[in-house]
Amino acid sequence: MGQLIDGVWHDTWYDTKSTGGKFQRSASAFRNWLTADGAPGPTGTGGFIAEKDRYHLYVSLACPWAHRTLIMRKLKGLEPFISVSVVNPLMLENGWTFDDSFPGATGDTLYQNEFLYQLYLHADPHYSGRVTVPVLWDKKNHTIVSNESAEIIRMFNTAFDALGAKAGDYYPPALQTKIDELNGWIYDTVNNGVYKAGFATSQEAYDEAVAKVFESLARLEQILGQHRYLTGNQLTEADIRLWTTLVRFDPVYVTHFKCDKHRISDYLNLYGFLRDIYQMPGIAETVNFDHIRNHYFRSHKTINPTGIISIGPWQDLDEPHGRDVRFG
């Protein structure tokens, strides 16, 4: 994990010395919006109108943030509209790379770049900041539209509806207040919470972060005992955002990030929810455990210097979940 500073790549880990051992995630830098008519979104500039084959998605199959965008692309049937490049799961001294020697990695199918940071420099030669996925790229203007996953999934939710996207609103007006409230604390204590625990460099920072992870999992277990999904019996973006963390929890976060008080498979409702969404048409196709496990265990040398990949634990995500019968 490194960063660009005024257009120059530096291989640097996160600085936690000045934060008492706490991991702090940087805000995404590119915040434009792709819209149905090209009008500006809540942030950034306008001009990014929804068009077939104009946009390209750069992802890692290992990354939970990028995974959100792949799921929304699948749910909305946007494969004919938005092409994809998949980086190599290993993120070492040069950050994300386009080495396609690992099965499932595609290389940079647009520009044949060697490293993802070269794409960022194509958009901004003087860019300073982390080089992350996902990246939503505009092939017409050769620039980054957005690298903020939370906003990309909202673009995908509606921008292509008039062009033939699949029906379905995963951020419906009647539920937006509830979804935003859920997203807030789930992001802080679960999605990013596992990273706060795993990347902590002091006992105090770890203790604080891991406690919040399991407090929130207990809260989610109660919510999912009341209805099939987080806001009721309708799948929303809040479920997708939570799910990409849950599917990585037992295979990676339990051991690698020391979130080992409980496994997701120890929770009746969370584990059922995990299997429920996994078994939806097309979702399993977006999951690649080889990329997930190789990335975390072999890329984070500060946490796991030997690069040894732990053995488990194993989950059978195809096991019947019964939540459709239970909640109707």
UniProtKB/Swiss-Prot annotation:
CDD domains per UniProt: GST_C_Omega_like
Keywords: Oxidoreductase
InterPro entries found in the cross-reference section: Glutathione-S-Trfase_C-like (IPR010987), Glutathione-S-Trfase_C_sf (IPR036282), Glutathione_S-Trfase (IPR040079), Glutathione_S-Trfase_N (IPR004045), GST_Omega-like_C (IPR047047), GST_Omega/GSH (IPR016639), Thioredoxin-like_sf (IPR036249)
Domain of life of the native organism: Bacteria
Enzyme nomenclature, EC number: 1.8.5.7
Enzyme class per UniProt: oxidoreductase
Site (Lowers pKa of active site Cys) residue list: Y253, Y296
Protein source organism: Escherichia coli (strain K12)
Subunit structure, interactors included: Homodimer.
Other remarks in the entry: The reaction mechanism of reduction of GS-HQs is believed to involve a redox-active Cys that attacks the sulfhydryl of GS-hydroquinone, forming protein-glutathione mixed disulfide bond and releasing the hydroquinone. A GSH comes in to regenerate the protein and release GS-SG to complete the reaction.
Active site: C63, Y195
Catalytic activity: 2-(glutathione-S-yl)-hydroquinone + glutathione = hydroquinone + glutathione disulfide
Keyword Oxidoreductase annotated: yes
Residues the record lists as binding glutathione: W96, R130, V131, T132, V133, E148, S149
Keyword Nucleotide-binding (UniProt): no
GO function terms (MF aspect): glutathione transferase activity; oxidoreductase activity, acting on a sulfur group of donors, quinone or similar compound as acceptor; protein homodimerization activity
Domain GST C-terminal: 172-296
GO CC list: cytoplasm
Pfam families noted in UniProt: GST_C_2 (PF13410), GST_N_2 (PF13409)
Protein name: Glutathionyl-hydroquinone reductase YqjG
Reported function: Catalyzes glutathione (GSH)-dependent reduction of glutathionyl-hydroquinones (GS-HQs) to the corresponding hydroquinones. Can use a variety of GS-HQs as substrates, such as GS-p-hydroquinone (GS-HQ), GS-hydroxy-p-hydroquinone (GS-HHQ), GS-methyl-p-hydroquinone (GS-MHQ), GS-menadiol, and GS-trichloro-p-hydroquinone (GS-TriCH). Also displays GSH-dependent disulfide-bond reduction activity toward HED (2-hydroxyethyl disulfide), and is able to catalyze DMA (dimethylarsinate) reduction. Exhibits no GSH transferase activity with 1-chloro-2,4-dinitrobenzene (CDNB).
Assigned protein family: Belongs to the GST superfamily. Xi-class GSH transferase family.
Dimerization as annotated region, ranges: 203-311
